[in-house]
């Protein structure tokens, strides 16, 4: 299936800036990927001395394969990039548009455990306006791949800048990393904040302060 124009533009912009997730060319169909993941997951679970003949575990390798391909890592495939509605700014709206408390769930690429948090996104319209739900869908798309929070924040910024044809975009993410909470240091209270600011949000202290102060 051919990629959408929006997907092609965003992918090219990320490659140009060195912000694309490290990925190899995709040579398998979704079903082929599921079959191969299922096979190797059986090997992993068997090495952990789990009895896959048990009713509770028998279908686990296939369930994991489907979850990886269709859900939590579906953002690795640009065929899944959301359908984007961008319209001309005929009304000349030039004030900040802000969407906050966007839920995000991603996966740490170092240990493949959960990153759970929220995003706040703002932009100042120039020529284009985007459907508000599309902002949430873009966050979700880039969250559904192995990630580091810093790159995820930048990817969402560049995607919106590319689609809206403006640099005036700001992204802030607050998240709990389960590689910190459930293993290693076992810190159950800390969270991580990242920001990516473009255009006037980066160059104008008042605009930057307005965005960051309202994001608390």
Curated annotation (Swiss-Prot):
Annotated GO biological process: one-carbon metabolic process; tetrahydrobiopterin biosynthetic process; tetrahydrofolate biosynthetic process
PROSITE patterns assigned: GTP_CYCLOHYDROL_1_1, GTP_CYCLOHYDROL_1_2
A GO CC term assigned to this protein in UniProt: cytoplasm
Alphabetized Gene3D superfamilies for the sequence: 1.10.286.10, 3.30.1130.10
Enzyme class: hydrolase
E.C. designation(s): 3.5.4.16
A GO term for molecular function: GTP cyclohydrolase I activity
Reactions catalysed according to its record: GTP + H2O = 7,8-dihydroneopterin 3'-triphosphate + formate + H(+)
Record pathway: Cofactor biosynthesis; 7,8-dihydroneopterin triphosphate biosynthesis; 7,8-dihydroneopterin triphosphate from GTP: step 1/1
Keywords: GTP-binding, Hydrolase, Metal-binding, Nucleotide-binding, One-carbon metabolism, Zinc
Sequence positions that bind Zn(2+): 108, 111, 179
PANTHER family: GTP CYCLOHYDROLASE 1, GTP CYCLOHYDROLASE I
Recorded family membership: Belongs to the GTP cyclohydrolase I family.
The protein's assembly and partners: Toroid-shaped homodecamer, composed of two pentamers of five dimers.
Name this polypeptide is given: GTP cyclohydrolase 1
Species this protein is from: Shewanella sp. (strain MR-7)
């Amino acid at each position: 299936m051919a990629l959408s124009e929006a997907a092609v533009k965003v992918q090219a912009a990320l490659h140009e800036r060195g912000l694309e997730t490290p990925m190899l060319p995709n040579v398998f169909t979704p079903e082929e990927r599921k079959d191969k993941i299922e096979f190797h997951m059986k090997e992993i679970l068997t090495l952990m001395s789990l009895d896959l003949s048990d009713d509770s575990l028998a279908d686990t390798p296939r369930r994991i394969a489907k979850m990886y391909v269709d859900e939590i890592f579906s953002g690795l495939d640009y065929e899944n990039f959301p359908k984007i509605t961008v319209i001309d700014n005929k009304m000349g709206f030039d004030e900040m548009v802000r969407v906050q408390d966007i839920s995000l769930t991603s996966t740490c690429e170092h240990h493949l455990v959960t990153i759970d948090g929220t995003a706040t996104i703002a932009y100042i319209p120039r020529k284009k306006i985007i459907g508000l739900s599309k902002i949430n869908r873009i966050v979700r798309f880039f969250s559904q791949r192995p990630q580091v929070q810093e790159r995820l924040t930048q990817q969402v910024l560049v995607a919106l800048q590319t689609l809206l044809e403006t640099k005036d975009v700001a992204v802030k993410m607050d998240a709990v990393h389960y590689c910190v909470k459930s293993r290693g240091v076992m810190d159950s209270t800390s969270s991580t904040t990242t920001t990516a600011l473009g255009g006037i949000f980066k160059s104008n202290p008042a605009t930057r302060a307005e965005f960051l102060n309202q994001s608390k």
